[in-house]
Amino acid sequence: MAAQGFLLNASFLLILLVLAKPLGSGLARLIAAVPLPGVAGVERILWRTLGITDHEMNWRQYLLALLTLNLLGLGILFCLLFWQEWLPLNPQRLPGLSWDLALNTAVSFVTNTNWQAYSGESTLSYFSQMAGLTVQNFLSAATGIAVVFALIRAFTRQNVHTLGNAWQDLVRITLWILFPVALIIALFFIQQGVPQNLSAYQPITTLEGAKQLLPMGPVASQEAIKMLGTNGGGFFNANSSHPFENPTVLTNLAQMLAIFLIPAALCFAFGEAAGDRRQGRALLWAMSFIFVVCVAVVMWAEVQGNPHLLAAGADSSVNMEGKETRFGVLASSLFAVVTTAASCGAVNAMHDSFTALGGMVPMWLMQIGEVVFGGVGSGLYGMLLFVLLAVFIAGLMIGRTPEYLGKKIDVHEMKMTALAILVTPMLVLLGSALAMMTDAGRSAMLNPGPHGFSEVLYAVSSAANNNGSAFAGLSANSPFWNCLLAFCMFVGRFGVIIPVMAIAGSLVSKKVQPASQGTLATHGALFIGLLIGTVLLVGALTFIPALALGPVAEHFSLP
């Protein structure tokens, strides 16, 4: 079993690197605002048609453009969901959503979280899925990538005040990266058996003679961008454990690769844009090390078997509860780590049914800020925040002004870095405390004791860090939970983006200083170790007390 797990993980990472490197080169061209081959003429027509100028923006203008797009999208999506019953492509005549569920869902998809307090096949029409959710899957992913583009330009430019044109970046990211790659993935899914139609649900008679209604819909097109954009919201309630979303082991592998593809490619793009590919590889090594360790822990925990079944004398060589037999325990464990290391949230197994330690690792990966590969764009700019913190700590230890890529890191950058890093822990801890202190929060818990607390902690961690996965034993479709999690999702997204853009605006105006003899090398093993230590230290100091009350306490209470 250990050898199988090693081969699965190694082959996954190898294929990922082979696919990510060429995509990284394309992303680097977009960061440099160089049109991809053969599309310059198309872009000129688009700019004229859409009224987009070549005027570059400072950080406030860039941020305002992104906020305008996202707030407009939030309002439109809320209206689509609230008045769903009056809109076309609703063959099942599904009613509109309640105001609180519509608000929660709209915020969820605009913020790239895709938390779902509803069952897709019994709640949303095809029009809501296509014109609402799928569109936001593209736009929220493009927003995250645009933010990291601006931050990378801040490191590579000097003595200027502009970070690019947000509208051009969004169009280029969507048309030349997200759409073509998602199209290829969608066609592969269709070939593997994922539905792509607008048919009404199909009544069938099972082999036992029972009547059943099979859900249909444009699944493949939404499934592709759901994974590529690290969105994670499933067309069906069972998400990627549903055979219509993830029918084969090949689609399962493709989905995991799609989740990590752009985050890994952005590391290569960062190195190329910075003029030193070692810088991007250093970040990739740090992410990969934490990822591999987490995969090993989850696989080890899940192959130990279910302690409750073992105590009852039943055969439980591995913990298969909540897992699909077509994937098995190892692929399910790998998927769980992939989807929570990235801010995706799609699941091919029920995380609530993992062992205490097996479920704690995905929760902790979210809590450290989704920086281990992370979401498209958000993962890299989150890791770069930890890079700034690491060079600041190193500067304190050796008595030098911290700098990264020749840019001196001053008080303003460190204040913004601290603010961005502390936003999500505050939301998680205060939100979980509020839920446990109120009757409205506790009434949603379906399990008592440490596991019930773990479900609450997981839900708020998932929302605040824009992941979207859940421990399913929580009845979260209530006004209290819909509003609490919507607030956490919104602040967790834009409460980080705003200080990141402020950092970019400060750094881009600075001069690049030549490296001196005492400059800390930020591409070697020493710095990689320091960066990993910084991520682990912040995560440990912040969340160990909460984890001790949940999964750790549950583990030690097992028979």
Curated annotation (Swiss-Prot):
InterPro entries: KdpA. Belongs to the KdpA family. It holds the Pfam family KdpA. The chain crosses the membrane at residues 5-25, 27-47, 63-83, 132-152, 170-190, 253-273, 283-303, 327-347, 356-376, 379-399, 416-436, 484-504, 524-544. It comes from the Bacteria. The gene is kdpA. It is a multi-pass membrane protein. It is found in: Cell inner membrane. GO terms for molecular function: P-type potassium transmembrane transporter activity; potassium ion binding. Keywords: Cell inner membrane, Cell membrane, Ion transport, Membrane, Potassium, Potassium transport, Transmembrane, Transmembrane helix, Transport. The keyword Metal-binding does not apply. PANTHER family: POTASSIUM-TRANSPORTING ATPASE A CHAIN, POTASSIUM-TRANSPORTING ATPASE POTASSIUM-BINDING SUBUNIT. GO terms for cellular component: plasma membrane. The system is composed of three essential subunits: KdpA, KdpB and KdpC. This is Potassium-transporting ATPase potassium-binding subunit. Part of the high-affinity ATP-driven potassium transport (or Kdp) system, which catalyzes the hydrolysis of ATP coupled with the electrogenic transport of potassium into the cytoplasm. This subunit binds the periplasmic potassium ions and delivers the ions to the membrane domain of KdpB through an intramembrane tunnel.
